Amino acid sequence: MMKAEAAGSLPKTNAEAVRKKPGRKRYGWMKGLLLPAVIIAIWQVIGGLGVVSATVLPTPVTIVLTFKELILSGELFGHLQISIYRAALGFLLGAGLGLMIGILAGFSKRTELYLDPSLQMLRTVPHLAVTPLFILWFGFDEVSKILLIALGAFFPVYINTFNGIRGVDAKLFEVARVLEFKWHQQISKVILPAALPNILLGIRLSLGIAWLGLVVAELMGSSSGVGYMIMDARQFSQTNKVFAGIIIFAVVGKLTDSFVRLLERKLLKWRNSYEG
């Protein structure tokens, strides 16, 4: 009798779990807003009480008003448009090359032996170390900025693509041989789908580093862009404008990351992975 009751209660529990799951997914993103909301509230209270000087730490309300001024003057969209153009072009160039060379090195041991040692050495060189060289070689023109961004965007995609291909289970190749897949079918139906999670992770990391590269490029030498706006505001002690620029970088970076995560969910529906 006890077993029958237990067995009868299991479907109900599972049904409740299924009913609750969509709700958790639908409203789960709101939990991520809790910490920023608390920080902003404390920040506003500290600034409002005058604990910290407004020159050092402007209140969130002041920063919002600064955003309003930048939008109405057209300054914000002008700088943001240029920054997005640079970041997008540098990312596409660097990530595209990283994907191509990662695939070549992943499939070919000989290519790996020729290229990987040099690429691993270059990967450890900081952006700030090569920035003076890029300026010396290419000047303060757009080319130096885009190449600097591309350099940072290259390595995450290259490493994750290479590791994704080399991490494919050898048993999948045996299955492909049993099914008499041709070489191009093994690549398109076995290797690349199995390596796709790593490749998408590389793209996410690459986007983040592309934005870091953009900041370095625009802070070191530029007459336009959000980075330039921050540097110009710093010279005139306009801390509220500096914070506005930082928030722009944070928001745009978060939006691009969310887009790639959405792409991951669409392309990796087949993967039954642990979600916590």
Curated annotation (Swiss-Prot):
It is a multi-pass membrane protein. The chain crosses the membrane at residues 32-52, 54-74, 87-107, 119-141, 146-168, 199-219, 242-262. It comes from the Bacteria. Signal peptide: none annotated. GO terms for cellular component: plasma membrane. Its main location: membrane. Induction: Repressed by sulfate and cysteine. Keywords: Cell membrane, Membrane, Transmembrane, Transmembrane helix, Transport. The keyword Protein transport does not apply. Residues 80-260 form the ABC transmembrane type-1 domain. One of its GO terms (biological process) is transmembrane transport. It is found in: Cell membrane. Gene3D superfamilies: MetI-like. InterPro entries: MetI-like (IPR000515), MetI-like_sf (IPR035906). Part of a binding-protein-dependent transport system for aliphatic sulfonates. Probably responsible for the translocation of the substrate across the membrane. Belongs to the binding-protein-dependent transport system permease family. CysTW subfamily. This is Putative aliphatic sulfonates transport permease protein SsuC.
